[in-house]
Structures are given as structure tokens and as C-alpha cells.
From Swiss-Prot:
It comes from Rhodospirillum rubrum. It is found in: Cell membrane. This is ATP synthase protein I. The gene is atpI. Its main location: membrane. The keyword Signal does not apply.
Length: 123
């Protein structure tokens, strides 16, 4: 574009956009350009799982400590709620890994996943 009076052609603009994107059009067709769980990185999923495990155990411990302080049952409630918090954390991690957490309510998510798997089997 040495001459400023002539506008660039549409083909030239399209070619330059494709070069600037780095050929991303082919990547989007593969699903890499989509949003949601398909685009989530392994590091992001790992961080989410670890945060959920830590927070559920911490919340369980806090509830147990509060109940122990209130009721005077020294380590009993804390141990019970730490175990319950750990179980809740493992259950949440399982949901994340299986992809069952993308809708409200586990039942709806399971139904949607079963429908999707049924459609894959038919194809």
C-alpha cells in the first residue's frame, strides 16, 4: 500500500486478517475456539479441583470447630465435619472431571449428559 489514495481490496484485507489471526480459522473449526469446558486448560481444571477440595475441608472444619465450641464436645464434631467436608470436596471434584457440573442441579446435568451420550451412540 504505497499509494494512499487507493483503498485496499477486500481480498487483501481478508488475507491480512487471516495472517494476523495466525490461521485461527482452522483451529475454530476443530472446537479449539469454542468457549466452556472444551477450552478449559488442564491447569485451570486442576486449580479448580484443588480450590474446591481445600475450601470444602476448611468449611467442614470451621463448622465442626463452631459446633465443638458451642456444644463442648472437643474434637468430635470437628473430626466428623472434616470428613464430611472431604467427602463433599471429592464429590465436587468428581463432578468437575465428569463434566456434570455445568447446569443447576446434578439430576439435570446427569440427564443432559445421558442424552448427549445417547446421541453419540446413534450417530
Amino acid at each position: 500500500m504505497t499509494d494512499r489514495d487507493t483503498p485496499p481490496s477486500l481480498e487483501d484485507i481478508s488475507r491480512r486478517l487471516t495472517e494476523a489471526k495466525g490461521g485461527a480459522d482452522g483451529a475454530e473449526a476443530d472446537g479449539a475456539g469454542s468457549s466452556g469446558p472444551a477450552r478449559a486448560s488442564g491447569l485451570g481444571i486442576g486449580m479448580r479441583i484443588s480450590i474446591e477440595l481445600v475450601t470444602t475441608i476448611a468449611v467442614g472444619g470451621a463448622i465442626g470447630y463452631g459446633l465443638d465450641s458451642w456444644l463442648g464436645t472437643s474434637p468430635l464434631a470437628m473430626v466428623v465435619f472434616l470428613v464430611l467436608g472431604g467427602a463433599a470436596g471429592v464429590m465436587n471434584a468428581y463432578r468437575v472431571v465428569k463434566g456434570l457440573d455445568d447446569s443447576v442441579g446434578l439430576g439435570r446435568a446427569i440427564e443432559r449428559k445421558e442424552k448427549a451420550e445417547g446421541n453419540k451412540d446413534r450417530a
